[in-house]
Amino acid sequence: MASAAVTPKLGWVQHQVTNGLHAVVGQVCRHPIHTLLVTALIAATTYLHVLEGTFRAANLGPGSKTDAAPFDVQSFLWGSRSLRLGETSSWRWQVGDLSEATGDGQVNHHWALVTLSFPGASVDDRSPAFLWNALPDSVGAEPITPTSNFFTSISNEFSLAFRVPYTQLSDFLEAVEFVASDKEDRSWAIRFPHGEGKPISLGRWLGNSWLSFLHRAKHAETVDMAIIGLGYLALNMTLVSLFRAMRQLGSRFWLAASVLLSGAFAFVFGLGVTTACGVPVDMLLLSEGIPFLVLTVGFEKPIRFTRAVLYASNQLRRGLQQRDVADKHDSRQRHMIPNAMLFAINREGWSIVQSYLLEIGALALGAVFRPRERFGQFCFLAAWMVLFDAILLFTFYATILCVKLEVTRMQNPGTLDLADDQHGPRIFGYKVNPTSLARWKLIMVGGFVLFNVLQLSSFFYRIMGGFMTNAALTPTTVSPFKVAANGLNDIYLAARAGGVETWVTVLPPIRYVMEASGLEMSAGRRPVFDGVLAGLESPLGRLCLMGALVFSLYLNNHLIPAARWHFSPGAPKESAAPAPPSSPASVPSAVPVPAPSSRSFEEIEALFKANQAESLTDDELAELCLRGKIAGYSLEKTLESIASAGSSSTATTRLEAFTRAVRIRRAAVSRTPSTRDLSGGIQESLLPYRNYNYELVHGACCENVIGYLPLPLGLAGPMVIDGQAYFIPMATTEGVLVASASRGCKAINTGGGAVTMLKGDGMTRGPCLGFPSAKRAAEAQRWVESPVGHQVLTDAFNATSRFARLQTLTVAQAGTYLYIRFRTTTGDAMGMNMISKGVEKALQAMTAHGFPDMNTITLSGNFCADKKSAAINWIGGRGKSVIAEATIPADTVRKVLKTDIDALVELNTAKNLVGSAMAGSMGGFNAHASNLVQAVFLATGQDPAQNVESSSCITTMKKIDGNLHIAVSMPSMEVGTIGGGTILEAQGAMLDLLGVRGAHPTDPGANARRLARIVAAAVLAGELSTCSALAAGHLVNAHMRHNRSAASSEKK
């Protein structure tokens, strides 16, 4: 009950989400330039706001150092770690809170471990002696052994470590703020954790960033570094896979770049919301977490959406190409791209949204359960990033994809003949050369990009004195044993020896930079880049850039619609030679979706009821089907009546009406709400429907037709059967089958061919009769088996057809039920309908001859037995009972079949006879007779379901006079050459190939009997070849070579 209640709700949610995506994507496709403009402006505003708020706050926050500001020790304590050692911690280092150490009056020993790093220091400077002169006597700093690792040599960094009483830390840091170097005009200066508010050059900023990276790497865990390195390596591989996937879809650069740009926008939006909510974001955690977030979320959803859109676009394009040339210039061309987007939404929209919801939910759980930890803070940011990525996928990226498809459609002459190919579009009433147009567009778009890049750079280099953070971007805590392991060991030994409670605060390493003693550069040597940025700061520079941006956007907004919809009002240009019509085998049959109807449903229904349905479009008729006004199964009848009632100028043939019915049914099926998630793609699928004679199908072979299935058809042989050579047609999707049968035919031909015998010919039908009592049923059985009753039933039966002649009656009783098995000839027809009509008349005659109390329970009581394996068919036969035999020379067995006679005989006995008996098989004493029977049945229009009893077969093999004798006995072969699927054109052609199509002109039933002999001979060839392959051990290798082909690549 619960599951039943949930399913409709899920379907409703899916329907609402899909409709919402339809509305959003439809709007952005109608206004692509506006969508790109709004998204770009919002993104630019957001990242400028984030940058300005972040870096200005950083510059004015704690730790800023100006000439007028006092020395701030707290800025150096950010990220420090305090440890305690004593009896309370069992003389082990224990992490503690700094407030406990500074507020506890019992603590007599509180040390600060300070590491000073001098990048690129000279050999003469590699001694602490040059610091002593700067230290006052009141500072009791003691040098200790600095801690080094692998990255020390890479960074070319010289470090000094000191143990300073915590109460004297401020005096020590102020004393070592500036340190003299071996160069008179330069000195070492502390690089403050949060900058000094001074602008720096681009090269210096990059250098500081590299040194900062090496500095962090030197004090990081090796395992952490390896994991982060693997993360970034995998990130690069993910980016490469994105570009490769988009390249396979036909875009070398722009679509992949658009996906990355959309992801960058999502990051900016997510960071803006996160900082606005007051959630602190760790910049180092960002650098560590973003690669793994990208690896987890990936680019699979944009790729899926792109693939679905391109697939739908290609299908619609193929559908338009199958129409006449005049149809290429109607409104369907305009709606091709939006319809492709909507089809992609139907196919992948809900699945993509579902994936996004799962990812957002998982990240939200991480943010809720661990809100105050770095992991929870990153989950909060990541959840917003994924949310904005989902929004941008169906807005910003969908717009770019729509524009890309429009450009591709305009550049493809096979898709649409543009009227302005030779003259170009017009701007403000003037013709524009396409080359100049491309150059102008490149300059304008480049101006927009340059404006944003320089605006971003101006914030970096105007404000940053290094790599900065603000209150929202806090530093990470240092690892004390990575930074000062040697110093901690020295303090541990001293404290343990003296038994003194000791606190140690390990500061993050303090880095020095080499600075000029005076002004580093004069006004006359101002960097060119800074001059450019200063120029951009002026009102005139900003005004010029904004003007160029507005003009670029206006130009694109004017050009793209002009190129999309500017077609010639006259007739289309005539091509040099008309293209030949596409055959159904060469072009898949995709259905172009018509433009939405402008008439309301009430108007459509009124026209239909007023017998004016000939004026309705396919889309409107499909809507009538969906609303239940036209039954789906009666579309052929409805459209046939519409065609016959139309005027002479609009009259269509019966075949055209039936083809249109199939097309409308496909549209109705694809739009059925209850199955749209599964059947929504049937309208534009590769299932063909054109160029088929549905007049032969209607009322004979199939109902609710939506197309036809092309099936591979092969020919085995030629094979000599009863002295006549035949090619045997086989329709199958199983590799090796036709090849194997051909090998069997070759082997049989060397022995003179196959010889067949027809042992019986009679179709059966077994009705079930009910009587008031078992005694009454027994009386009826005696009457049926008596000469009088037999004659009455025979006369009534034979009167129904000139071909039907009753042969035998087999009667069986079960309680009050009586089963009578009628067996009769049926000419060249398979005969099920013929015998059913005769049985019905015979039972009426029986009722009139003394059995008015008889009740016909069913006309087919499974005593036939039809489409079921049964012993009565195996023993008594049904249809044609055929035997086929052949003698294979021993030399052929060795050279052609690659085995020997004794092995074949033993295999047949052990497998086909004993093995089937052990399995309790009924008529299955063969290797694979059903394979051959079904393949020939499909090729010649037989009833596929009757393969069940027709495949009953026993294969025998003997060694006679040194040669192999093989025979197959098939007692219930049910075939016909008229009626059913034999009326179809393709199947009829295969009957012509065998010379057995239709009824025999002089000998009724001869064609059907000949077909049964051919089928039995084909089974004989298949059995011989397959058993030989099994005996030689070649079966698996043959199937792996011929039936396991790799998927073909679309790229040629």
From Swiss-Prot:
EC number from the UniProt entry: 1.1.1.34
Active site, UniProt feature: E734, K867, D943, H1039
The reaction(s) this protein catalyses: (R)-mevalonate + 2 NADP(+) + CoA = (3S)-3-hydroxy-3-methylglutaryl-CoA + 2 NADPH + 2 H(+)
Organism classification: Eukaryota, Fungi, Dikarya, Ascomycota, Pezizomycotina
Annotated transmembrane regions: 223-243, 253-273, 279-299, 349-369, 378-398, 440-460
Protein name (database record): 3-hydroxy-3-methylglutaryl coenzyme A reductase mokG
GO biological process entries: coenzyme A metabolic process; ergosterol biosynthetic process; isoprenoid biosynthetic process
Region (Linker): 461-617
A GO term, aspect molecular function: hydroxymethylglutaryl-CoA reductase (NADPH) activity
Species the sequence originates in: Monascus pilosus (Red mold)
